């Protein structure tokens, strides 16, 4: 490299990397939306390409298989979900846990009327290790968030099971699932604060 080239090379390299990351993130967001809307069995890779508004070559450059596309969608959704849950959350304790469940109901209404996308992915691809790992990491992170915000390690599994029960019952029961979970949650927190 010439002296001039060596001055610009780091800048050019960084710019290409940033563009790569932006495109990758845009594709992951589009994949999340497509899988949420159509499920995992229905969309073919060409349909996913159209949903992402990129060429097939570009799609495969970033995500070389349908399973890799699913993992990207799940990881993108995971980040979005945690941010959504934490938006305007009180500091900690019972009010925070109630807030998380209220946000979960809002999420189910707006983004997941057909149930938990992670569980749906696992049902569609039960033998895929990458998808299994992405779902497991997501679920463990949600459980850890419950512990962190409730400050109740002793209730971690119970709170997590309430969360999972609500998200899985939502497509059938709707708001009734939330109302029941909220009632159980209030009783649980009251009972364990005595």
Each model region followed by its residue ranges:
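Short, basic, alpha-helical segments at the C-terminal edge of helix-turn-helix-like DNA-binding modules
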Residues: 75-81
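Amphipathic alpha-helical segments used for helix-helix packing
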Residues: 108-130
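N-terminal intrinsically disordered/low-complexity leader segments
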Residues: 1-22, 194
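Hydrophobic alpha-helical connector segments
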Residues: 72, 86-111
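Hydrophobic/aromatic-rich alpha-helical bundle segments in the mid-to-C-terminal region
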Residues: 131-136, 140, 149-194
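Helix-turn-helix
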Residues: 26, 30-68, 72
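Short alpha-helical scaffolding segments that buttress acidic/His motifs in well-ordered protein cores
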Residues: 104, 118, 122, 159, ...
């Amino acid at each position: 490299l010439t002296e001039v080239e060596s001055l610009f090379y780091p800048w050019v390299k960084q710019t290409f990397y940033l563009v790569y990351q932006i495109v990758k993130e845009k594709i992951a967001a589009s994949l999340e939306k497509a899988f949420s809307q159509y499920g995992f069995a229905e969309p073919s890779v060409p349909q996913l390409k159209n949903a992402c508004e990129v060429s097939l070559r570009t799609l495969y450059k970033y995500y070389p298989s349908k399973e890799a596309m699913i993992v990207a969608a799940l990881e993108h959704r995971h980040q979005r979900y945690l941010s959504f849950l934490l938006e305007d959350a009180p500091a900690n304790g019972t009010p925070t846990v109630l807030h998380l469940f209220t946000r979960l109901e809002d999420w189910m209404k707006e983004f997941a009327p057909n149930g938990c996308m992670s569980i749906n992915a696992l049902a569609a691809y039960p033998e895929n290790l990458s998808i299994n790992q992405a779902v497991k990491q997501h679920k463990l992170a949600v459980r850890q968030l419950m512990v962190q915000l409730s400050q109740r390690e002793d209730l971690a599994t119970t709170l997590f099971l309430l969360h999972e029960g609500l998200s899985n019952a939502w497509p059938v029961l709707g708001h009734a699932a939330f109302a029941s979970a909220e009632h159980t949650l209030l009783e649980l927190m009251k009972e364990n604060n005595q």
